[in-house]
Amino acid sequence: WLIKLGGNFNDVGFMGGATNKRCHRPTGGAAVGPEVVKTLYNAVEARKIDLRTDSQVVDLIVKNGAVAGVKVKDEDGKVYEINSKAVVNAAGGFAGNNAMVSKIIPRLKGFATTNHPGATGDGLLLSEKVKAAFVDMDQIQTHPTVVETTGVMVTEAVRGNGAVLINKEGKRFFDELNTRDAVSAAILKQTTGHAYMFFDDDVRKSLKAIEGYIKMPGMVIQGKDLDEVAKNMGVPAANLKATMAQYAKDQAAGKDSCCGRTKMERPLTKAPYYAILVTPAVHHTMGGVKINTKAEVINVDGKVIPGYFAAGEVTGGVHG
C-alpha cells in the first residue's frame, strides 16, 4: 500500500528474531520513519485532506449509541465540534507516558522512551469513555539499542547489517539478532546496564541511517583502529581485539562460538571502527483497544461500537 502511494521500501533486510530478510526499508538503508511520514504526507496533500495541527481531540461525540464525531481543542484553547459519519482512532500508543507504563509494569519506571512526546495514551482514554474493550495492555516492548541521554533509537538494521554488542569489559555477550525482549534483558545484565553497538566501516557504508547518527554531536565514538576505538570507548583494548579476532574467525567459518548468532553478514575488519553506547528503552505498547477484522472497535460486552474504528498502535492484539 505504501509503495503504491509512492514510498520507497524496496530494500529488504534482517531484523531481530527474524530467520529471513523480510523487513522493508528505503533503498540504501535510510531510516524508515521519515520515508513513511513523507509518503503519507504527500498522499494527504495530493488528496487535499484537511490536516489540523496544534489540535487535541478531547472527547468523542456519541449520538444514538454511535460515534458521530469529535470535540477538538485548538491552540487557543477553544473547543469546537466536528461531526462525521464515523471516527478512526489512530492516536498511537502510550510509550511516552511513563506513569501509565510503570503502573502496568513497575520495573519500567524511569525508563526512557523512543517515542515522540505525544505518545501519551490519549486515544485509549477516549476509548474508555465509550466502554471499549482492551486487550494485551501488559504487552510492552522495549527496544534494546537506545541512546539514553537523547532517546534516539539506533535502528535494528545496524545489527542486521553486521554490528555486534560489546560490554564495558570489551566482550560480546549475546546473540545480537535475538528477539528484542531477550536482547534487552541481556544488556540490562551487563555492567551499568549498557552496551556498545560496535561496527566497522563496511557496515557504515551499507546503511544510510548511520550517517545521520554520525552527524549527531557526541553520539558515535570513532577510532582509526581497534586500539584507538577501545581507548575512546573506555574498554580494555586487549579484550576488544581478542573478541573481534574471534568474531572474524567465526564469521569465516559460519559458526558463532560465542553467542550462537546465525546471521553474520560481515567480518567487521574494515577500519575505521565505530561504537554507540546504548541501553533498552520503552518502545512499543502492543496492547490497546480490541478490534475485529474490519477494524471496528469492540466494547466490553463484545459488541461493535457503531461508527468507531481504530488502527495502528492504539489497537491491541494486532502487533507482535
Please place each PLM-identified region on the residue numbering:
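Rossmann-like flavin
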Residues: 1-16, 223-225, 231-240, 246
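Conserved redox-cofactor binding core of oxidoreductases
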Residues: 1-80, 97-100, 251-270
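Short Gly/Pro-enriched turn/cap motifs at secondary-structure boundaries
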Residues: 21, 27, 114-117, 153-156, ...
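A glycine-rich dinucleotide-binding beta-alpha-beta segment and adjacent secondary-structure elements
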Residues: 59, 239-318
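Hydrophobic "anchor" residues
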Residues: 67, 172, 297-298
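Glycine-rich loop(s) and the adjacent beta-strand/alpha-helix scaffold that form part
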Residues: 75-147, 151-152
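Short acidic/His/Gly/Ser-rich catalytic and metal-binding motifs that mark active-site loops
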Residues: 95-101, 206-208, 317-319
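An anion/pyrophosphate-binding glycine-rich loop and adjacent beta-alpha core
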Residues: 124-126, 132-235
